[in-house]
Every structure is written in structure tokens, then in C-alpha cells.
């Protein structure tokens, strides 16, 4: 039956077939690969995989601690199939997303680096050229002047003195050559440790950094292999950097005294001049504290086009003289909390806090080289 259905493909215009497939989630397309050889060849074609990623890019939230994934639109909670290797090396200290690939740092004695595609369930371990430290900063992207699929990793050595020009301060790993190289690049900023996971947008890495008394956005371009200061940014106790609409940066802010939330947005990152402007704020009294204590995990979030926020964060409650950590998924708009879903709870002393509560990624068919 599968083969007879496959023979019907030529009866439809090829362009129409592709347009239909572009609207199907990556998780479902994987099952289509076994239908017949024609489907397999199409779905595994490089051109198709990247077109699908650019046409259909719904976000997912993932928590490796609970092994849970939530679709922020349907609010369906499902199991995340965490590789066995990650379970042995848990906890994952941080993750950075690029084209459906997650660059993961593991907080164990060897501080391993790995690249993981949650949809394809592929994982690749990256052996550092020197010992990886938890104070190092990592990012993932690509040289868009050469080939999008030749992904690269930047490792900025956090403990090297910035005024010592004799020592390299960063390294680049290239997937296709499976090798590291030293890069001597000028770097005059201090990356904020609370936001050190950074954001990869269209192959370039962005971080919140501090220079003297000012907070700013810095960018690393994998094409030119240079750092650049992009724009100043607002900053408060809870400051989380994210991507909006595929080509802009977002900031989620919440102060220490006030529970009010501010959302800031840049214009397109391809513009000559980039700056932040306030998108909207929320001042209703029912807002949760997105980051209760410095020792607890930072929230993971995304911003919707209807001036709404989806955020997965930790809370704390006391019941009968016992303290519990409550994991809750919220949807918030300008009028306050619209929905909240409790997804997990733990005894305070049984819970080993991850550095970030959750991560946002886009499912993709892109294989790991």
C-alpha cells in the first residue's frame, strides 16, 4: 500500500507537494521517510531540509531535568527523549540553539561539549583542544559566505586575562574538518554570567556583556571571525536575551522590587543601525517572580506576535513546614497571566537546580555532520 501511494506523487505538481510538506512538523516528516524511496530522498535532501526549516519554524520548550517538551501554542506536554549519554553526565549546564541543533555543555568533571538534534535523536561529542572550564563561554553558528551547513563552535576562554596578548582568548571548532583552531581576537567586554548561554541568530552569536558601567549586546560573526558591539541594552535583576521572529533580539526584564515585566525588541539585525525599543510591559499585581533567587534557575521564554509572553520558570511554596520547587508554564499578555500550567514539583532539598529552567528551540531535520 505504501508503494502504491508513493506512485501517486507524480500526479501532483512537485512544487505543490513541497509546499504541503513545508507545513508539516519535522517530528511528523521523520515518519514519512519510511513511506517510500521518493519520500525519503526528498525529505533528506539538503535543499528541502533548509527550506522546511525556514518555512515552518514553530518553537518548542525543553526541560532536560524533567525530560519534558511543551508546544507553547497547543500547550501539549510530551516526553523528551534525552540521550543516555546526557543522563550519565547530567546536569546539562547550558544549551545554545542554531537551526534545530543544540550545543550543550555538561557540568561534570570533564565538562564535555556535545551537539544534539532532539528530533533526529542524533548526538555528537566535541573533544576540546584543552580542558573545558565552566567559566568558558560557547556559541554556535556558521559562515554564511561559504556554506550554511558547515557549522562552527566558538569557545571563549573565560579565565584568560584580557590584557595578556601573548595568550589566545578564543578557539573555533569546524564541524566538517573536525578540528579546532586558535583565534586571536580583540575582546574588551565582560559577558554577564547570568546570561552566558547567549543567542544564535542567522548564524551569528549574541551575548549581553558589560563594558565599564554600560550593558551592551556584542556579536560574533563566524564569517569574519570578529566581535562587534551592536547596541546598548536595558538591564535589571532578571534580564533574559532571546530571538524574535527569526531576525531580531528580544529582552525580558523583571525588577527586584517590582514584579512588573518589560519586553524590549530590536529592529532587524541586518539593519545598519540596531537599537532596542520597548515592545510592551505588564504591570498587573498577579505576576509571578520569574527568578526568585540567584541560586535558582533563570527562566526560559519566547515572545509572541500578539504581545504575549510564554515562560517556563521555577517557583517556591511552603506546605506543612516543607519547601517545594514548583515548575510552571505561563502565558502572559498586557493584561496579566492568561494561563498557567504546573508541569512538575520537587522537594526543595531533592531538586538539583539547572542553570537555566528551560530552553527554546526550533525542531529541524538538519543532521549533525
From Swiss-Prot:
InterPro entries: F-box-assoc_dom_typ1 (IPR006527), F-box-assoc_interact_dom (IPR017451), F-box-like_dom_sf (IPR036047), F-box_dom (IPR001810), Gal_Oxase/kelch_b-propeller (IPR011043), SCF_F-box_component (IPR050796). Gene3D superfamilies: 1.20.1280.50. Pfam families: F-box, FBA_1. The lineage of its organism: Eukaryota, Viridiplantae, Streptophyta, Embryophyta, Tracheophyta. Residues 6-53 form the F-box domain. This is F-box protein At3g08750. It comes from Arabidopsis thaliana (Mouse-ear cress).
